[in-house]
Design a protein with these regions (language model features):
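Canonical alpha-helical transmembrane segments of integral membrane proteins
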Residues: 234-243, 301-315
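Transmembrane alpha-helical segments in integral membrane proteins
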Residues: 46-53, 122, 159-176, 345-361, ...
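Hydrophobic alpha-helical transmembrane segments
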Residues: 32, 146-163, 336-346, 405-418
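Sec-dependent signal peptide hydrophobic core
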Residues: 34, 112, 413, 437-441
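Catalytic domains that recognize anionic headgroups
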Residues: 287-291, 295-298, 306-345, 349-361, ...
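Helix-loop-helix
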Residues: 1-287
């Protein structure tokens, strides 16, 4: 971030974020960008009304003073010259308690208007959501209005309307003012006409509404009993809005009903304030409290470091590797810098501006509010919403963000209790609060520094270990030799295959020669637990690894990843390793684990094929969203879902022509946006033909690839199953709802994640099918053994047959296994019981003369395969930064006897235990 980026984030982007959140929330409710602009204008004007009232009062005070002193100043300037004039003016000003710098008070409104205008301009002039959208006579809110054509010349009418309203307001406001004041305001009105003439109609419409609001405000300032009239008008507007929204505006939905009722109630507040004036008194201690600038500043700084430093740094520190893309590298610390700038700009600068312009009584109230906010934010962050599942690099929860009514009620009760306690503390020990907050600031900063140092250390290690062979990733396949390919699709669901092939029968021809093993189980339900045995065989099952309790899990993971590549390398194969999962226990695989084997080519490919422009868009999104995430975590549970907004954090430009940031879903069948995380993996599968080099020599080859296309659930456009900026599968699902029953077995597909996981699995297989066609066309399909498997299934609850009586979901173990051998034909299904640890045996069978583990010396073949039932670990401890000792953290252990689809075949062995294999 440059100096100007930081300055803009401090001053402008907090306002732009406010514009964006208000607009997106309004548009989500009313469903019309034009109406959303009206709602935005009303909301922003009411929000800053106290600010502008104070600024206008200061301006009026300065104007009256200027008029009062005008004759005296004019006389001095006419009578005296040089230093004598200066001395006389200084004396005259001092006698009238006036300083020349007070002239800045008259420009307060202008100083406030400039950043708000810049923020509105930056947001609305680039808002993709307005493009092509009509509103009334305006054909396109994303382009100049062009409402009038004269002699073939298109004239934009809105800027002239805006200027006319502005000039009328200026005439009323400057009545009796000095000529120079009038000239300043008229010049500004003409400037906006010229500057905004070619701007998008949506922006000009917004600014026209602002000028209209300003005109109404100016008129009411001149009326007697203006506050009563204004209160009545607001009340009538609220009633009208409620009637229109409830009975005449489109199809009513719960969200719209709540919105219009809430808006109607809010618009009753001005009238209520008028009616209650003088009748309702605040507690004497609250009314009589003196403002404490130290309290306000220390509270604002605490909120800034909590949301801008601690929360973002804690998220990144939990797994720094996830926030690194080596193909478009940005140090994650810059996300913290960006969040801190947002937070300082919001809580210190703009809160401070509001505070400085407030009356003393309001300042005292703001002191207590900021103090209470500190307590509420800290409690919400530390004690609520702690078990929300995996958080992706795009700050999206895998399982969404949902809270029960009970959880929200408990949280609300705690929030009210904290508010009451902090208010009581402020009334008793007000002078001590700044000191308490200072201690809190120091503690938060220290924790954040520790997090940041840990992040920097991890990133340095990642950069050192993630160096590939250089150049474009590629691998060779021989036309005359034998090729072995092992493809791991993370979290691919084995039970989905019959449904996918039923819907897409063309896959059967593309997967010619494959055998689908429908009765396959993994040794664990998380990648860190299951992949050692998948890549290393039965010596690396969870129980076997626990038995080696003098070695770190990361070292055993690295060893398992090297078993097959090193074995094939030692047997003369040309070996390529792509994205070795959890190598070095890093999200970005540490390729240095192969440094002792120079002939093994290795590459990290996730994100390599994504457009750099799109990656930069994702980076920009994260710079914004880290602060939004922090605000969400510090907010009460009842509003977190609205702030989270399905992982978009109310981002207006969520869908754009030149980038993606993530996906926002509205139900199970429709979505907007494209997920960067998904595309980083999907593009690898789509580019497999481009990185496959066909060799005519007889050198045998081995390639292993790990891919996350099936791991990052997003909604795709059916029936093509491709990512799209706008997804709407409503009609397709209505017409094909029966496809989830095959051979008498029904798979439950109801929720968003059910559809998303299924669609990602389909998308992955479709891309593999295209690649297999490419291999056929180039004559390297028949002489290639291909193993497609996954490390585990998912806890989805989609098959009643896999739900155990104790709550265990065996679908978590139901991994994918499909094998094509050399010269095999036809697509077949086998119900033979298989474990993921069988993959190494299948890979080396009949192609390695002496299949011996290069690290243990034990054979890897059917003869040496264990005969006893294997222990399967049902543990959700996926985080390798936590589950990183010498043994896996205690979990539940099961065995399965021959048939994963038979509930009676599953047996619980131990709960919350650490089991080891018998030796």
């Amino acid at each position: 971030m440059s100096f100007w980026d930081i300055l803009g984030t401090l001053l402008i982007k907090p306002l732009q974020l406010l514009f964006e959140v208000v607009f997106v929330m309004a548009n989500r409710v009313v469903g019309d960008p034009g109406l959303a602009i009206i709602a935005l204008s009303l909301a922003m004007n009411f929000l800053v009304l106290p600010l502008y009232r104070r600024a206008d009062a200061m301006q009026e005070e300065e104007r009256e003073t200027e008029l009062r002193l005008h004759k005296g100043v004019a006389h001095i300037k006419k009578t005296f010259r040089g230093d004598e004039r200066m001395m006389m003016l200084q004396t005259y000003y001092r006698q009238n308690n006036y300083k020349p710098t007070y002239v800045l008070k008259g420009a307060t409104s202008l100083f406030l208007e400039i950043p708000f205008f810049i923020a509105a301009y930056a947001f609305l002039s680039n808002l993709e959501l307005l493009h092509g959208v009509s509103f009334g006579p305006i054909r396109d809110l994303g382009a100049p209005d062009g409402l009038l054509t004269v002699a073939g010349v298109t004239v934009n009418v809105l800027p002239f309307l805006m200027t006319a309203i502005n000039l009328v307001s200026c005439v009323i406001f400057t009545k009796g003012s000095l000529p120079k004041t009038k000239v300043q305001l008229y010049t500004m009105a003409l400037f906006f006409l010229v500057f905004l003439y070619t701007s998008p109609a949506g922006l000009v419409f917004y600014w026209t509404l602002n000028n209209l609001f300003s005109l109404i405000k100016t008129i009411f300032y001149k009326l007697r009993h203006a506050h009563i009239i204004l209160g009545v008008l607001f009340s009538l507007a609220g009633i009208t809005a409620a009637v229109y929204g409830l009975f005449f505006y489109g199809q009513p939905t719960p969200r719209r009903l709540v919105f219009f009722i809430a808006a109607a109630l809010v618009l009753q507040l001005p009238l209520l304030a008028v009616l209650c004036k003088g009748k309702v008194r605040l507690p004497e201690k609250l009314c009589g409290a003196q403002p404490s600038k130290k309290l306000f500043v220390s509270g604002s700084v605490f909120l800034a470091v909590l949301t801008g430093l601690l929360i973002p740094s804690a998220v990144i520190h939990a797994s720094p590797q996830e926030f690194v893309n080596m193909t478009s590298f940005l140090h994650p610390a810059w996300y913290i810098v960006s969040a801190l700038c947002f937070a300082v700009g919001t809580f210190v600068i703009w809160f401070g501006i509001f505070y400085s312009l407030a009356k003393p009584s309001v300042k005292a109230l703001l002191d207590q509010c900021v103090w209470a906010l500190c307590g509420i934010a800290l409690v919400d962050y530390m004690f609520f919403g702690r078990s929300l599942g995996n958080l992706s690099a795009g700050l999206v929860f895998d399982n969404g963000l949902q809270f029960t009514t009970g959880q929200m009620l408990v949280n609300l009760a705690v929030v009210l209790a904290v508010f009451a306690a902090f208010t009581f503390a402020a009334s008793k020990w007000r002078q001590r609060i700044p000191g308490i907050l200072t201690v809190g600031i120091i503690a938060v900063v220290c924790m954040s520094v520790v997090n940041t140092v840990g992040i920097c250390r991890s990133i340095n290690e990642i950069k050192a270990g993630a160096q590939s062979d250089g150049g474009t990733p590629s691998f060779s396949l021989s036309k005359t030799g034998k090729n072995v390919i092992v493809l791991m699709l993370d979290r691919a669901m084995g039970p989905y295959i019959p449904y996918i092939f039923n819907e897409k029968p063309e896959l059967e021809a593309q997967f010619d020669g494959f055998t689908y093993y429908s009765n396959t189980a993994s040794l664990g339900i998380k990648t860190n637990i299951s992949t050692p045995s998948l890549f290393g065989g039965y010596e690396y099952t969870p129980a076997e690894l626990n038995a080696r309790d003098q070695e770190l899990l990361v070292d055993k993971q690295n060893e398992a990843l090297k078993v097959l590549p090193v074995m094939f390398d030692q047997n003369g194969f040309d070996v390529t390793v792509l994205e070795p999962v959890y190598a070095g226990y890093g999200w970005v695989p540490d390729l240095s684990i192969f440094q002792d084997y120079p002939d093994i080519r290795r590459f990290n490919v996730r994100g390599y094929f994504s457009d750099p422009k799109l990656q930069k868009q994702a980076i920009r999104s994260n710079k914004r969203n880290f602060f939004c995430y922090a605000l969400m975590k510090a907010a009460p549970l009842c509003i977190q879902a609205n702030l989270y907004d399905y992982g978009t954090y109310n981002q207006g430009n969520f869908v754009s022509d030149d980038g993606y940031a993530g996906q926002s879903t509205d139900g199970a069948l429709t979505a907007s946006g494209i997920s960067a995380g998904f595309m980083n993996s999907y593009n690898v599968l789509a580019n497999l033909p481009n990185i496959t080099q066909i060799s005519k020599d007889d050198t045998n080859t081995y390639m292993v690839l790990t891919n996350d296309t099936t791991h990052d659930p997003v909604l795709l456009q059916e029936p093509e199953y491709v990512p799209a900026p706008e997804v709407d599968n409503t009609q397709y699902e209505r017409e094909h709802a029966d496809r989830f029953t095959v051979n008498g077995r029904t798979m439950t597909v109801e929720q968003r994640n059910d559809y998303a996981y299924y669609q990602c699995n389909v998308a992955a297989l479709l891309q593999l099918g295209k690649w297999f066609d490419y291999l056929r066309e180039n004559g390297v399909y028949d002489n290639t053994r291909i193993i497609v498997m996954s490390d585990h299934g998912g806890t989805m609850g989609q098959f009643p047959e896999l739900l155990a009586d104790d709550g265990m979901d065996a679908e978590s173990f139901a991994s994918l296994l499909m094998v094509k051998d050399f010269n095999s034909k036809g697509f077949t299904t086998s119900d033979e019981f298989m474990l993921s640890a069988d993959v190494p045996l299948l890979a080396v069978k009949d192609v390695v003369a002496e299949p011996v583990n290069p690290f243990s010396g034990r054979r890897i073949d059917e003869v040496s395969k264990p005969k006893q039932e294997q222990l399967l670990l049902y543990s959700f401890e996926w985080d390798v930064n936590v589950n990183c000792g010498t043994q896996f953290i205690a979990g539940d252990w099961y065995t399965v006897n021959g048939d994963i689809w038979n509930k009676n075949a599953w047996h619980s062995v131990a709960n919350k235990a650490v089991l080891t294999a018998e030796r």
